[in-house]
Amino acid sequence: MNSPWWKERVFYQIYPRSFQDSNGDGIGDIQGIISRLDYLKWLGIGAIWLCPVYDSPNADMGYDIRNYESIMAEFGTMEDFEQLVEELHKQDIKLVMDLVVNHSSDEHAWFIESRKSKDNPYRDYYIWRDGKDGKEPNNWSSFFTPSAWSYDKTTDQWYLHLFSEKQPDLNWENENMRAEVYAMINRWLDKGCLLYTSDAADEL
């Protein structure tokens, strides 16, 4: 019985920004990755682990995602990504992508809607709480800041972020949010991603 491919192949992690610049702007990009596939194949690489290429304001180097359905402009276009998938297939190199769904960017459309009002349909996509005596709901700290809570004066509540204040935590108790994330995942799988690494999975 043959072992699954992900147990046997050599993986190579690619951080797009610093891997290979194809157009001289000083930023690595998808076309740069494509240009190095022959070399990766020669090395014996059987799968690449691609760090985030999604649209992001880059408050945390791409791990703050503004739009899960778009490619960061600095890295290229969706057509470039589709070409990458095609070229990987020709080289028999599998594609694994970072899945960042513990949180989104605070510029994501869901969070923009969520912070508008307490009765907004997207409010419960994130974790909001009342403060205590004018302070944070509790004493939790984040990985990046002393407090895991940030105040939003629009609705006089605090939102949870286990990373930076630019990365509000998604509420995995919300069924509608989960359904949207699962649908997004399936769309990327349909494009040719074969497997995900779940970033910050232990924080979900």
Question: For the regions a protein language model found, what residue spans apply to each?
Answer:
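Acidic/aromatic-lined carbohydrate-recognition and catalytic surfaces
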Residues: 2-182, 186, 190
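A glycine-centered loop/beta-turn motif at secondary-structure junctions
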Residues: 191-195
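Conserved small/polar residues in nucleotide/adenosyl-binding loops
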Residues: 196-204
